[in-house]
Each structure stands twice: as C-alpha cells, then as structure tokens.
C-alpha cells in the first residue's frame, strides 16, 4: 500500500540559506540557535538542559543541519544509528513566506514577486481600506501598521471592543491580517470581512488574508483563539496534491494546509489546534488512510507560538514534545509508506525582529525503500513534490529532482 505522510514543522529552519544575506538573515539558524541556547542553560523555562531529540536525530535531523551549517548543533553528534534519508533544501521561490514554501514543496515554486505593504505606519492605501469598509458597512478601522499579533492586541484590543472597529495590520510577509474579538465582533462577521478583503486585494497580489480572532477581557488576558483562517490565492499551477486527487487519490489536510493551498488538491480537511491535537489527528488519519493517500499536517505552533514570539524555551519544549510522539507515527507505517518531515522557512527565535528567516529546511525521508544516508543539498523544496510524484507514479512535476 502506498501512502505518504508529510509532517511540516512550520518555521523549523536548519541554517541560513545561500541567499540569506539578501533578506537580512545571514547567520540565522533556527535549529542551531535553539540547541545552543539549551546547551547554555538559557532555555530552562518549562523544560531544562540540552535539547533532546533522539527520534528526529535517528531520522537524520542533526546530520542534515550539519551538512547545512558545517558543524553539528550543540548537544548533537555523529553518534546515532540513522534510520532515515536526510538532506537540506534551498528555497527557489522569491519569498520566505508560508504559501511560497508550501507551494514549492508541492512542486510549484513562486517565481514572481508578491505584493507587500512596506510602510511600517499607514501601511495600507486609503483607496483599499475605503472599499473594504464600505462593502462591510463599517465606519473605521484600527492599526494600519506593521505589528506583532500579540502586541497589537495589548495595544488596541480594548479600543476595538469599545468601538467595533476591526484591527488591520501586516508584517514583512505578503499578508493582510484582521484581528477581531470573537464575542463582541463575532467570528462569522470576521470571516465575511476577510472574504471582502481577499477580493479587494486582488490587484495588489497579496499572498494571504488572515483572520485573527481573539478572546479575553483586557490586555492581561487577550489571547488568539484556535479559529484562525487563512485566505490564500490559488497556486499558479497544479501541485502534486492536485495531480494525486485527479488520479483518484486522497489528500487529507490536517490543520491549516487546506487554507494555504486555497483548498486546491484537497479531498478532506481535519481541524485541530495545538501540537498535541495536531499530532493526534495526524495519527488518526494515518490509521484510516487507504491506498494512494497523502496525509499532510502543518504544525503551526512552532511558527506562530514560538518563532514569531521569539520564545526559545517554548520552541525547544515543543520540539521535544513532537519528538516524543514520533515513535507512535513510525509504528503505524507500513514498509511501502513514505514519511517526510520538513519545513516551509525559518523563524529563528533568537533573531532580531519578529519575522521569518531565510533558511535551508530539513528534508527527512523514511520508508519506501529509501536507504539511510545523505540526500545532500537539494536545490529546491520542489524536490519533495517531485519525489512524491515519482512515488505515486504520477506525471512528473515541472520543477524538482526526485530523491526516490
């Protein structure tokens, strides 16, 4: 039986990419810097000691990172019995954003330039916001700036609740984000507002509109809920997900995968929030998956909770939890199944600012007759999509080189 499981550790980079300097990210290293902080006792909040990832290490994580950076991360060495094939991949796409990374790993790199709102204050054109407000029947909005999603709630959440005005903000990514309180503004009202924004943003070539619902009574307890929703553009070409679906296969989205691909190539969506629930849902879907199925999970917490918030200890704790669950996944796989662990970009929690970092991503592959050992440096994330196409005997993708 042929099945593929893709476990996408959102933002888990393994060292500055070859073109990182162009992005201001030379020297970034999500995995390496987390390991260093742990080894130095600087990540002992909620956990303690060196970063411990025995199962990821057996799959080749430390070796992939070593080939990327030239040295083993602190606390890791060439002393494990490898069971997986490992490599690291350079992004071909023009950005370091979520859609670009996901689309490229499915065989469709983003070779055009996204639109961005580059001004840190007064970020959005008045013509755009006027159209959104008019269609939504609103008399104003808050924000209009680059911001951290948690900080802006502390600053504007109460005013939003009093006024009913939505909070519009952006970042270095190609994104338009709208934060609204679930109780006072309403979740469905937020979703409708995002749909309007998605339509009005068409001429601006913005990659995503993101609904950022939150709850709480004030700055001390405002918190995002699990009802985030991404409104992405459709990929510019057919991904390997589309091709498997067209061939009669199944593509199961766990978490926000369906949103990122604008539901293209998806046959089933499973909602789950948090590392534990996402892992549980992934296991459940693998247990019931039949022939010619992809189960594709985005573990978003690594990015949203730890990377962007520059929470080194939280990131380390999350990785160790994820690692502790991997034996459950390995036990479910048949000999012919293919397991791939990778990332879509970096988000070094020790780096300046709050944005993504341009990094190589790990490519860890297990099963399907693959021999343990190095896959080397891959020239594109699209090698993953091409390998999946080869595995399922689908029509080859335009980009990427198969390692199967």
Swiss-Prot record:
It is an enzyme of class 5 (isomerase). Mn(2+) 2 binds at residues 303, 308, 356. GO terms for biological process: 2-deoxyribose 1-phosphate catabolic process; 5-phosphoribose 1-diphosphate biosynthetic process; metabolic compound salvage; nucleotide metabolic process. Keywords: Cytoplasm, Isomerase, Manganese, Metal-binding. It is found in: Cytoplasm. InterPro entries: Alkaline_phosphatase_core_sf, DeoB, Metalloenzyme, Phosphopentomutase_DeoB_cap_sf. The keyword Repressor does not apply. Binds 2 manganese ions. Pathway: Carbohydrate degradation; 2-deoxy-D-ribose 1-phosphate degradation; D-glyceraldehyde 3-phosphate and acetaldehyde from 2-deoxy-alpha-D-ribose 1-phosphate: step 1/2. Belongs to the phosphopentomutase family. This is Phosphopentomutase. It comes from Shewanella sp. (strain MR-4). The gene is deoB.
């Amino acid at each position: 039986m042929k099945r593929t499981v893709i476990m996408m550790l959102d933002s888990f980079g393994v060292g500055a990419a070859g073109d990182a300097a162009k992005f201001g990210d030379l020297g970034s290293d999500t995995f390496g810097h987390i390991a260093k902080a742990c080894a130095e006792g600087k990540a002992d909040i909620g956990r303690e000691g060196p970063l411990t990832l025995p199962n990821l290490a057996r799959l080749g994580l430390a070796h992939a990172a070593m080939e990327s950076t030239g040295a083993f991360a602190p606390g890791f060495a060439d002393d494990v019995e490898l069971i997986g094939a490992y490599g690291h991949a350079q992004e071909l796409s023009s950005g370091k954003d979520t859609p670009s990374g996901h689309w490229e790993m499915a065989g469709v790199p983003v070779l055009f330039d996204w639109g961005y709102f580059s001004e840190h204050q007064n970020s959005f054109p008045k013509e755009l916001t006027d159209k959104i407000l008019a269609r939504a029947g609103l008399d104003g909005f808050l924000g209009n700036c680059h911001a951290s999603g948690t900080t802006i709630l502390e600053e504007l959440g109460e005013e939003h609740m009093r006024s009913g005005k939505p909070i519009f903000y952006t970042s270095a990514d190609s994104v338009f984000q709208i934060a609204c309180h679930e109780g006072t503004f309403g979740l469905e009202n937020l979703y409708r507002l995002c749909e309007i924004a998605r339509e009005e943003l068409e001429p601006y070539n913005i990659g995503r509109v993101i609904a950022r619902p939150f709850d709480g009574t004030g700055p001390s307890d405002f918190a995002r809920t699990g009802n985030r929703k991404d409104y992405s553009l459709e990929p510019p070409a057919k991904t390997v997900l589309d091709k498997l679906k067209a061939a009669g296969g199944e593509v199961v989205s766990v978490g926000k995968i369906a949103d990122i691909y604008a539901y293209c190539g998806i046959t089933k969506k499973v909602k789950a929030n948090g590392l534990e629930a996402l892992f549980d849902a992934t296991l459940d879907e693998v247990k019931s998956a039949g022939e010619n199925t992809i189960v594709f999970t985005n573990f978003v917490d690594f990015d949203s909770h730890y990377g962007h918030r520059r929470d080194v200890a939280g990131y380390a704790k999350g990785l160790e939890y994820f690692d502790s669950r991997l034996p459950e996944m390995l036990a479910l796989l048949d000999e012919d199944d293919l397991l791939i662990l990778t990332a879509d970009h970096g988000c070094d929690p020790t780096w300046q600012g709050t944005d993504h970092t341009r990094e190589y991503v790990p490519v860890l592959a297990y099963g399907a007759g693959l021999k343990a050992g190095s896959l080397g440096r891959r020239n594109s994330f699209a090698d993953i999509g091409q390998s999946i196409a080869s595995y399922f005997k689908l029509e080859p993708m335009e980009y990427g080189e198969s390692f199967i």
